[in-house]
Design a protein with these regions (language model features):
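Active-site beta3 strand of CheY-like receiver
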Residues: 10, 49-55
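Receiver (REC) domain active-site loop signature in two-component systems and cognate sites
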Residues: 60
């Protein structure tokens, strides 16, 4: 079962008390949270265009946070993953950041630090997804311009109309003289 696009934060921590406290902090800030006790199987549940962020403990039984980070970034290298740990040291933080973590928080941390990092990560995620969408639209438009020859005002208008119609599920009937290349 895939994760709903309404979920903004997937929170993974094996400590149920801390998971509940962090979930409550994020809930009170108006964020929709999916709390999980383990990371196994998460990658299969997230689509490449899921609009949220992942907050994960590093040290957990089964799949740890660094393994999860590598797996998630194998599917989508631009997905923000925040790693938290109670056993932080400088080499671990450096390893996490080099692996592509968006942020690294050492427990105990202020709620505001988590909220600030999550909000910045969500803003970045929105920009990344908007950028992908715009690139796809530009690519589609460029493909159309290479297939339709001509630069007259009528051809430009035709390209615009085709672009607008392509986004709908309507049937289209093209009329014209025989041999005109309909």
């Amino acid at each position: 079962m895939s994760i709903d696009n309404q979920i903004q934060v997937v929170l993974i921590d094996d400590d149920p008390h801390l998971r509940q406290a962090l979930c409550q902090t994020l809930d009170l800030a108006g964020l929709k949270v999916l709390p999980l006790g383990e990371a196994t199987g998460l990658t299969a549940r997230l689509s490449r265009d899921w609009p949220g962020v992942v907050v994960s403990d590093i040290r957990m039984p089964g799949m740890d946070g660094l393994e999860l980070l590598a797996e998630l970034h194998g599917q989508d290298p631009e997905l923000p993953v925040l790693l938290i740990t109670g056993h932080g040291d400088v080499p671990l933080a450096v390893q996490a950041m080099r692996a592509g973590a968006y942020d690294f928080l050492e427990k105990p941390f202020a709620s505001d630090a988590l909220l600030d990092s999550v909000r910045r990560a969500l803003a970045l995620r929105r920009l990344v997804l908007d950028n992908r969408s715009l690139r796809l639209a530009l690519s589609d438009r460029q493909q159309l311009s290479t297939r339709l020859v001509g630069h007259s005002p009528q051809m430009l208008r035709l390209r615009e109309q085709i672009g607008a119609l392509a986004a709908t599920r309507a049937d289209v009937l093209i009329l014209g003289e025989t041999g005109a290349g309909k």
